[in-house]
Amino acid sequence: MNNPPAEESLDPADWEAMRRLAHQAIDDGFDYLQHVRERPVWQPVPDRVVARLREPAPRLPQGAEFAYREFKEIVMPYSMGNTHPRVWTWFIGNGRTCAAVGDLLAAVLNPNMGGGNHIPNHVEAQVIDWCKEIVGFPAESSGLLVSGGSMANFVGLAVARN
């Protein structure tokens, strides 16, 4: 007699441990933003850090705690510095605490904005209406929220072409 396979899930094996890790990530992220002025805008990535990223893929699961520890050690210290107030290179927008919380909430919902009658579509429509009102566009004009400046430029070029 064959036993059916155990149900697989993407849920954490330990919700409380994942909750603690998420809270730690939020605390560390806020500390990173709060103390950004105390760090250099940018620093070169040491060869030893690049070497760690070139290691073969792990053959066994490493766990969320391990992945977060790696992020703190080899990613956070060597970012481009876009959140630093002395970054004047290009418009990318500074990472802000409200934006980080908003990104977290959006990731939790993970909405598909392609269609359907769910509240994120209504929120998007309202934000577009507010933007039209603020800049004085006609109420019947349309709009679209995109992921960032590169996508906005791409969409703008496509609209201009067509």
Model-derived segments and spans:
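N-terminal entrance/gating region of PLP-dependent enzymes' catalytic architecture
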Residues: 2-140
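Conserved beta-loop-alpha segment that forms the PLP phosphate-binding cup at the N-terminus of a helix
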Residues: 124, 128-129, 140-162
